Design a protein with these regions (language model features):
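A broad, low-specificity signal marking well-ordered, structured residues that form hydrophobic/aromatic
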Residues: 16, 103, 133
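Generic helix-packing signal
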Residues: 46, 112, 140-142
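A generic structural signal for residues located within well-ordered alpha-helices
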Residues: 37, 41, 100, 127-130
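Helix-centered, glycine/charged polyanion-binding patches within enzymatic domains
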Residues: 54-126
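Charged phosphate-binding loop/patch that engages nucleotide di/tri-phosphates or the phosphate backbone
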Residues: 132-148
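Polybasic low-complexity intrinsically disordered regions
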Residues: 1-87, 136
Length: 148
């Protein structure tokens, strides 16, 4: 899952792209190599949602790594309203009291990191690592929905 890239010199590791609901419950997870840009995994992450979505459009909060016209177009095509903070907008919105929503995904990443098997990747095959990430997501969903 890693390969040479002239900008980060073949950075090693794995990146988890997670789509969550407003409570931080994972709806979709895609893993890529650490040297893969976020833009390349955005459509795969949106397409891998397995729960049935409502017919009305839903809000989709994205960070600056997804600030591309292609991402906005693809998310609109999938009935999402993209909210991407463009460069320089973040400081202005903080001044007027706009609530940050990025912490929801960061908390979900923290929940993933509590599973020691995911914190440091020992698995050689990406399928095995994805299975462990999905198992962790199942436990997070169980704790979030069933246990409240």
């Amino acid at each position: 899952m890693t390969g040479p890239n002239p900008t980060d010199r073949g950075k090693r590791g794995t990146k988890r792209h997670v789509l969550t609901d407003k409570k931080g419950i994972p709806l979709s997870v895609v893993i890529t190599a650490a040297n893969t840009h976020d833009m390349k995994a955005a459509t795969d992450t949106l397409d891998s949602v397995i729960v049935e979505r409502p017919l009305k459009k839903q809000n989709l909060c994205l960070d600056k790594g997804y600030d591309f016209p292609e991402i906005e177009r693809e998310s609109t095509k999938r009935r999402y309203i993209p909210h991407i903070l463009h460069r320089g907008e973040e400081k202005e919105l903080i001044k007027i009291g706009y609530p940050a929503r990025r912490w929801v995904v960061e908390r979900t990443n923290s929940w993933h990191n509590r599973f020691r098997k995911l914190l440091i990747r020992y698995e050689k095959k990406s399928e095995n690592y994805l299975a462990l990430v999905c198992l962790a997501c199942c436990i997070i969903v169980y704790r979030g929905i069933i246990l409240g």
